C-alpha cells in the first residue's frame, strides 16, 4: 500500500511533528515525515508540543520545521493534512499532489485538527487526543 507518508500542518512545529512521530511508532516499517505549508523552517518543535508529546510517550527530539514544496510532494505516496484549507494550499503549491492528499482526521468524520499554537496546555492536550485517535485509525487502515 503506502510506504511513504508526509504529515502536513501550517508551521510544522506543533501538529505535524506529533502526528509524524506518533504514526511512526505505530507503523515502524513506513517512511513518515512532516512539513508545513507556512513552515517555521529549521525551528524546533514548539515547547508546548514537546511537553504534551513527552507526557504521552512521544519524543519530538531533533525535529526541525521544513517547508512543503512541489519537489517534496513527489517523494511521498500519501499526504495527510490537519485542516481542510491545507488541501487547497497543497493543491496550489503542488497541483499534482491533490489526488494523494487527505485529512489526518479523515476517519474522524473528516474532522479538522485545530492549530494549538500559542494556546493553553489544555488546547494542546485536546489536539494531542485528536491526533492520537486519527493516527490509530490511519494505522489500522494502512496495516491492512
Curated annotation (Swiss-Prot):
Enzyme Commission (EC) number: 3.1.3.48
GO molecular function annotations of the record: protein tyrosine phosphatase activity
Record keywords: Hydrolase, Protein phosphatase
Organism domain of life: Bacteria
The keyword Hydrolase belongs to this UniProt entry's keyword annotation: yes
Catalysed reaction equations from the record: O-phospho-L-tyrosyl-[protein] + H2O = L-tyrosyl-[protein] + phosphate
Catalytic machinery residues: 9 (nucleophile), 15, 115 (proton donor)
Pfam families: LMWPc
InterPro entries, per the entry: LMW_PTPase, Ptyr_pPase, Ptyr_pPase_sf, Tyr_phospatase_low_mol_wt
PANTHER family, per the entry: LOW MOLECULAR WEIGHT PROTEIN TYROSINE PHOSPHATASE, LOW MOLECULAR WEIGHT PROTEIN-TYROSINE-PHOSPHATASE ETP-RELATED
Family according to the record: Belongs to the low molecular weight phosphotyrosine protein phosphatase family.
Protein name in the entry: Putative low molecular weight protein-tyrosine-phosphatase
Organismal lineage: Bacteria, Pseudomonadati, Pseudomonadota, Gammaproteobacteria, Enterobacterales
